[in-house]
Amino acid sequence: MNIQVFSGDICSKTAGLSPHNDIRVELFLAGCKMAREGHPCPGCFNSPLWDSKGGRSQDISEVIQYIEKMTDNRYITIVGGEPLDQYPEVVELTKRLKEEKFHIVLFTHYTMSEVIQSYAQVLKHIDMLIDGKFDMEKRIFDTDLRPGILHVVGSSNQKIWFNYSGEFVDVTDCYDLRPFYEGGGEHKRINL
């Protein structure tokens, strides 16, 4: 199975958390149907990724080999465009990455309820979901940051969902993820 990849890079800070100084592989997938239909997220900075034919079509096995050659760090963030525009391919990619023991963060402009309704299979294979359209009017700047994990979102309307033992927990307002690894935390949970 092939997936349309725009680029891959080693990134820190914006790609999410990792125990390796927050350095993760960031995989950019091509295609955003919403933008191509004339409704991009206002202020989207990834317009080169809107074209579903952009980048290159690659076998998923080759993509995984490429990622493993980049680093022995097993932390990856999948962004776009809109990754879920390639839903069957993303399910297969995340499934195989999870089999290789990767920690996976997926960004999508869909809300968690939309993902559950139309894209639920991908939730079985990811560790965190960042949901919601980027909103330039609610953009978060470095000067706005507070301690915790909020630096991984681009605008304040986006939510961070953590897969805690098969339940997705809204951890957007958390300062520390340790309680979720240890079984605590009193945030909104969504059972799959």
PLM feature segments, named:
Residues 1-53, 184-185, 190:
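N-terminal [4Fe-4S]-dependent radical SAM core
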